[in-house]
Design a protein with these regions (language model features):
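Short glycine-rich, flexible loops that bind phosphorylated cofactors or substrates
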Residues: 1-2, 25
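A structural signal for short secondary-structure junctions
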Residues: 10-11, 28-29, 61
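Conserved acidic donor-binding loop of glycosyltransferase catalytic domains
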Residues: 2, 18-20, 37-38
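Short hydrophobic beta-strand element within catalytic cores of glycosyltransferases
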Residues: 5-8, 15-19
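Residue-level signal for the nucleotide or nucleotide-sugar donor/cofactor binding architecture
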Residues: 4, 38-39, 52, 72
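A short, well-ordered alpha-helix in the C-terminal region of glycosyltransferases
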Residues: 49, 56-70
Length: 72
Protein backbone atom coordinates (compact mmCIF):
# COMPACT_ATOMS: atom_id res chain seq x y z
CA UNK A 1 0.00 0.00 0.00
CA UNK A 2 0.88 3.67 -0.19
CA UNK A 3 3.14 5.04 2.53
CA UNK A 4 1.00 8.00 3.59
CA UNK A 5 3.13 9.08 6.57
CA UNK A 6 6.24 9.26 4.40
CA UNK A 7 4.43 11.23 1.70
CA UNK A 8 2.94 13.59 4.30
CA UNK A 9 6.35 14.21 5.82
CA UNK A 10 7.84 14.92 2.42
CA UNK A 11 4.94 17.24 1.51
CA UNK A 12 5.49 19.18 4.74
CA UNK A 13 9.17 19.63 3.89
CA UNK A 14 10.37 17.39 6.71
CA UNK A 15 13.54 15.35 6.50
CA UNK A 16 12.41 11.75 6.05
CA UNK A 17 14.56 8.86 7.26
CA UNK A 18 13.02 5.53 6.31
CA UNK A 19 13.83 1.95 5.47
CA UNK A 20 13.87 0.49 1.97
CA UNK A 21 10.61 -1.27 2.82
CA UNK A 22 9.07 2.01 3.96
CA UNK A 23 9.95 3.61 0.64
CA UNK A 24 8.52 0.82 -1.53
CA UNK A 25 6.23 2.28 -4.18
CA UNK A 26 7.70 5.77 -3.82
CA UNK A 27 10.35 6.69 -6.38
CA UNK A 28 12.23 9.11 -4.12
CA UNK A 29 16.01 8.69 -4.07
CA UNK A 30 18.41 8.28 -1.16
CA UNK A 31 20.35 11.48 -0.44
CA UNK A 32 18.23 13.40 -2.93
CA UNK A 33 14.73 13.48 -1.40
CA UNK A 34 15.02 11.08 1.56
CA UNK A 35 17.51 9.21 3.70
CA UNK A 36 17.39 5.42 3.46
CA UNK A 37 18.44 3.60 6.59
CA UNK A 38 18.09 -0.16 6.93
CA UNK A 39 20.20 -0.55 10.08
CA UNK A 40 20.33 1.15 13.46
CA UNK A 41 23.76 2.49 12.54
CA UNK A 42 22.54 4.03 9.29
CA UNK A 43 19.62 5.70 11.11
CA UNK A 44 22.11 7.21 13.57
CA UNK A 45 24.35 8.34 10.69
CA UNK A 46 21.44 9.99 8.86
CA UNK A 47 20.33 11.86 11.98
CA UNK A 48 23.90 12.91 12.76
CA UNK A 49 24.38 14.18 9.21
CA UNK A 50 21.23 16.28 9.48
CA UNK A 51 22.42 17.77 12.77
CA UNK A 52 25.93 18.46 11.45
CA UNK A 53 24.90 19.88 8.07
CA UNK A 54 21.68 21.83 8.36
CA UNK A 55 22.11 23.22 4.84
CA UNK A 56 22.20 19.73 3.35
CA UNK A 57 19.22 18.63 5.47
CA UNK A 58 17.26 21.68 4.29
CA UNK A 59 18.15 20.85 0.67
CA UNK A 60 16.87 17.27 1.11
CA UNK A 61 13.63 18.51 2.68
CA UNK A 62 13.07 21.07 -0.11
CA UNK A 63 13.73 18.43 -2.76
CA UNK A 64 11.31 16.08 -0.98
CA UNK A 65 8.57 18.71 -1.08
CA UNK A 66 9.27 19.41 -4.76
CA UNK A 67 9.14 15.67 -5.46
CA UNK A 68 5.64 15.51 -3.97
CA UNK A 69 4.50 18.55 -5.95
CA UNK A 70 5.77 16.96 -9.18
CA UNK A 71 4.49 13.42 -8.62
CA UNK A 72 1.38 13.72 -6.45
Amino acid sequence: GMRVKILEGMALGRVVVTTSMGLEGIDAQHLKEVFLADTVESFVEAIALCRQDATFARKISEQARNFILRHY
